[in-house]
């Protein structure tokens, strides 16, 4: 009984497209991160501003586009799961996504396939938008779209037109294809359906003999849908190429699709067939007059008639025995385009001003290391006269930290391909927007300065029919200027190639290791006062690969920079008065003593005794007024107007206590406890009097709880003469006791407006003329509202609502309709901060929560929320607004300070000036992220692997791994017989351990291991060093594997280190610790994991695990061992209990006994899966286990000896299996925060990191909580519309292990449950009633407990 929740959203960009999806005003960029679809507005200077974002309940595996009928917008095809396609359309009225149709093919695919289906199917789109194609292995599904009957005639007329408005983006990583945005065939409705019936075929039904499909693509410039199939009738790999040297075949088929109401018929006609192609070809990239087939070792060009015109050899492994083709031998370049790590983009020729073609067709390829290659293609008719490849000479290191490109999309397409903006998503490294300048000039200058040495064309054309082509190609042979067989000279371009970084999207994936340690709370005292982040621990992860690898600090709260600290004796509220742009006066008040004081900010905070400020009363509000020439002070019963020397000018007395004040020059709005409001205007001429503003008469019938003066254009369409104006108007805004928000202008003429639906917190709100209800029931829940702009460079208007229960709701103003606000419930990722019905009284009882808006907090427009747990609302330009905890101490008051800072007062009367930390910080995910670079120019440690935290020294240790040239050495240390120095060699590894001080994040000590060694595991463990006294000491244990040749047995070693304190180096106070080796031992077999158990430590040696004990003389002896079926992938301990994961056979549950020494097998998993990581999952007194496998599943098993089918616990009971959207790489056990009461036994939770940059947690639940939340989840799934028509149950639970688990006890998905908090109030209560009489109250408490479970990191250990 557990619940899954995302701690961090995915950050790796897997797919992207440029299209008109939500608006026709500009071309948008659609970006996919695992299950999140983001829509960005690209600017001309390459900035990306988020406009919409949607979170789906399934893994998005591919996307495509088709045009809408009678609309400039496009529909989105979303491929999810194994084989599902959702067709989506953006609804501009509701600002959400509508699902037009859902097509499920998995069942049909399984019925026709003779082998197990691949986990992901591949989507292909016809350039003419007549159909879509989805294939999995040899099974192909066609989804036709309705077209006009006159299409054929229209296409014949348009046959000669150039399709240069199109653009093809092709990702070889998942063979994912975006689509062009043009529509050559006009679609129309057949009946009322959007699509025709689908057809599912085996590849051999299209072309006899087609099997083992490698790739399928639609070709271009055909009047009918035409596909190219690349396949191998007999599978071949590098080891058996001598038996079948050229096994790959290629066929071009034209499809005749005949849609009908009942069934669709597809007939195929063979255009061309090509055989005897190299075995390593893997991807088809269509171009204007044919296709480029990309292989690991070759590039081949086949035209649309199926003629293999030319082949480029990329490396020395390429097959030089190809027949009937022109061979360009560039094997000395040693380029490799691996199938899953190569991406391409094809851009057709642009049009010149006179309508002709510029002949600048462009094809770019990127390899695993992010090198960009230009494919040179020049043709005369269908004859290719130039075909070559060269690496773009990028002189800067913009792509040094990026690897594994996933997708490429062109932005801001212009009439020329000379310069282009490209958006590139990477598996490791930030997604980048790059500007390629002078691309054409680079190519031209390169051709003009080619060296004329040797020939690089190998001709072997024996067919008499190709003699003419032979002559043509022979003339072109000397034109190629790349490195040749006879000359090793290189070519340098005359014109430098300029690449410019315009913007980026933050990526922290892949996460390979997680630990918990002190980062923001290392210093107990800052500026003489306690650290505001005291007792706070952070999650720290290793992120990225290669030179881009770094540490990512996942902060549980915002860590501000402290500029100034002050200590006060009597203070509860604080205000800063600026005069002429300088901080002049600091006003404090103490409500407990009814006292106010003035301090001179520019005079070392000396107490100011002059002036007539009311000091013997509690100040409710004070600020500058009247163009900074006056000061306004409001006490509990009076309003005072002063000049800048605090000479009193006007006094106004109130009969009731003032509870709220809002000021905007030249108006002041006062709300009193009776529910009345007063509005005053400053006399314009002398600025010595306050004039009362007339209020609408209908306000006399209302009870007002708070008021606000703001500027907005949301009511313009209701104001005479302003319906089309964008100018912001001054609006007096009020919240009534029946939770209505009303507006009126100064010249109101008794006409006021209301925001409909806000009392129920509906998903969509709209402004209309106010209608007085028949009966008003005062039940105030809305405490405060704000309408202001949030963001960094691109600020957007939001309505923010704070309730008396501490909840924060946020609505965004519709860009299409200024009078409407909406809340995206499908992406409502605002943190939960409170609960209605007094369900979370603890959060709002001690210190009042009040929102404060700051238009410039170090460049960001933010909202602070004071309280016992303070919050900050902040928005990055490329993300939705987020709510974070601000520090780890209460805040009672906050005021602007200096230009970009704030001054805050805590609950013990300390004041601090905070500035937002922006260096290497990112506030666009669910928690603040800080990037820490360990490598530098001198020391590049490449990939950071295992990370641990040394609690006693408060230091981090991380292992690194860099690639080095591999040397095949025998057991004697000499090079093996047959070693050839002249061929490309494999790469080996070299590892080491770094000791890092988090105060400076500098490496203060390191240990390097020999070449061909890898640190597989590293742990910080409390090891018993004296068996009599049971004294323990914290040691670092590292397990190492040595990479040797195939003929030598594997070996490894384990090393034990202590972190000792030393005298620091002069001028380097952070170098006060060093690593000291305690013990090391070489062992037979690789050491894949180490683990502490009951004061000893366990290591794995190939198929054995041994527990070792450290003696007093620091020697180590083995005391117990156990055999493992295949290979240990992970191991964890809990006291004297162990779980050991196997690479093929699940995992075992082991008990360790020290008297006598032995390892006892308590149970094992019966389900056989490839264990990736595992952890104990403790729920009360029950012992559960969480294990993840290579198929993206997390399994929960239980040790239950009382279960009848468990054989007294020997078989672990399989409770549930839950599908993840990415591969899990690490998992750890953390204490769990209990927000309501303290449990009798400690509670825990699991936290795991994933390859896509996301982090998740698994939280155990009690039976009562589980049942309540299970009902709510079921109701939301059944009664609420799901994005893309996806079923959250199916996406998470439909896996191969579903039948083994308890069908009535599946793992819950908090992503579904938290939608409960975003529903309208009436729908929320309706759903809660299904779970019980008081379920609404209890459900909120359950949700808060899950939401706040990670706050255990803020309470120390």
From Swiss-Prot:
<dbReference type="InterPro" id="IPR050358">
    <property type="entry name" value="RSE1/DDB1/CFT1/CPSF1"/>
</dbReference>
<dbReference type="GO" id="GO:0005847">
    <property type="term" value="C:mRNA cleavage and polyadenylation specificity factor complex"/>
</dbReference>
<dbReference type="InterPro" id="IPR004871">
    <property type="entry name" value="Cleavage/polyA-sp_fac_asu_C"/>
</dbReference>
<dbReference type="Pfam" id="PF10433">
    <property type="entry name" value="Beta-prop_RSE1_1st"/>
</dbReference>
<feature type="compositionally biased region" description="Polar residues">
    <location>
        <begin position="450"/>
        <end position="459"/>
    </location>
</feature>
<dbReference type="InterPro" id="IPR018846">
    <property type="entry name" value="Beta-prop_RSE1/DDB1/CPSF1_1st"/>
</dbReference>
<keyword id="KW-0694">RNA-binding</keyword>
<dbReference type="Pfam" id="PF03178">
    <property type="entry name" value="CPSF_A"/>
</dbReference>
<dbReference type="GO" id="GO:0006369">
    <property type="term" value="P:termination of RNA polymerase II transcription"/>
</dbReference>
<dbReference type="InterPro" id="IPR015943">
    <property type="entry name" value="WD40/YVTN_repeat-like_dom_sf"/>
</dbReference>
<comment type="similarity">
    <text>Belongs to the CFT1 family.</text>
</comment>
<protein>
    <recommendedName>
        <fullName>Protein CFT1</fullName>
    </recommendedName>
</protein>
<comment type="function">
    <text>RNA-binding component of the cleavage and polyadenylation factor (CPF) complex, which plays a key role in polyadenylation-dependent pre-mRNA 3'-end formation and cooperates with cleavage factors including the CFIA complex and NAB4/CFIB. Involved in poly(A) site recognition. May be involved in coupling transcription termination and mRNA 3'-end formation.</text>
</comment>
<dbReference type="GO" id="GO:0005739">
    <property type="term" value="C:mitochondrion"/>
</dbReference>
<dbReference type="GO" id="GO:0003723">
    <property type="term" value="F:RNA binding"/>
</dbReference>
<dbReference type="GO" id="GO:0006397">
    <property type="term" value="P:mRNA processing"/>
</dbReference>
<dbReference type="GO" id="GO:0030846">
    <property type="term" value="P:termination of RNA polymerase II transcription, poly(A)-coupled"/>
</dbReference>
<feature type="region of interest" description="Disordered">
    <location>
        <begin position="445"/>
        <end position="465"/>
    </location>
</feature>
<keyword id="KW-0507">mRNA processing</keyword>
<comment type="subunit">
    <text>Component of the cleavage and polyadenylation factor (CPF) complex, which is composed of at least PTI1, SYC1, SSU72, GLC7, MPE1, REF2, PFS2, PTA1, YSH1/BRR5, SWD2, CFT2/YDH1, YTH1, CFT1/YHH1, FIP1 and PAP1. Interacts with the phosphorylated CTD domain of RPB1/RNA polymerase II.</text>
</comment>
<dbReference type="GO" id="GO:0005634">
    <property type="term" value="C:nucleus"/>
</dbReference>
<keyword id="KW-0539">Nucleus</keyword>
